[in-house]
């Protein structure tokens, strides 16, 4: 992947990211990725009574990274753990999203996540905006139309191609609520992937 490589450490899969965000796909990701570098400000935290020391990024870094990462999965794999990550951060630090985050569609998505924290997790974070997409985000988490790891539930060449095409268009439509990304580029990226790995064209797993 142009974004990250994978390796295993003691049997645990690890993603070694080249960038914090997917700057190769989303136009908004590039300036947000640069902002994350300025927000990093790691500080040392002692664990287990001081036996271990780890460095953690600033709350502002985590606020932007966690919410943007969740947005990248909108329509294609957003899960309850994305909401819980945001809820834990809100509970610890409150609303600490950097003031430099001004994109209205991204802010609407973050507000929608926050509304769900209030409704589902009994939190009380003041938030305004994002109401029109709250139910969409909820359905994506709890009842995804195209589960990312659910495989292809149809058989036959035509049925598989039709299912995958509908899934691609659906994912694009969902992510277009937040990001500017060309449909034709998404289609071209899919074509290139399948040309490189022809066996994946009709793969159902």
Residue ranges, per PLM feature:
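Conserved NTP-donor binding/palm subdomain of two-metal-ion nucleotidyltransferases/polymerases, i.e.
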Residues: 1-205
């Amino acid at each position: 992947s142009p974004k990250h490589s994978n390796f295993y450490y003691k049997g645990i899969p690890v993603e070694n990211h080249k960038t914090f965000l997917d700057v190769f796909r989303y136009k908004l990701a590039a300036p947000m990725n640069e902002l994350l570098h300025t927000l990093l400000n790691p500080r040392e935290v002692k664990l287990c009574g001081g036996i271990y020391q780890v460095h953690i990024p600033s709350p502002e870094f985590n606020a932007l990274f966690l919410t943007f990462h969740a947005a990248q999965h909108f329509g294609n794999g957003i899960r309850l753990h994305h909401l819980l990550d945001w809820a834990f951060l809100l509970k610890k630090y409150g609303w600490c999203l950097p003031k430099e985050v001004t994109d209205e569609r991204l802010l609407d998505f973050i507000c929608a996540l926050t509304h769900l924290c209030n409704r589902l997790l009994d939190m009380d974070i003041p938030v305004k905006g994002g109401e029109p997409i709250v139910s969409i985000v909820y359905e994506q988490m709890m009842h995804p139309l195209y589960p990312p790891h659910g495989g292809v539930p149809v058989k036959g060449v035509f049925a598989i191609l039709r299912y995958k095409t509908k899934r691609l268009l659906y994912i694009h439509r969902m992510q277009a609520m937040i990001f500017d990304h060309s449909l034709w580029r998404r289609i071209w990226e899919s074509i290139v992937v399948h040309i490189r790995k022809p066996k994946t064209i009709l793969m159902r797993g």
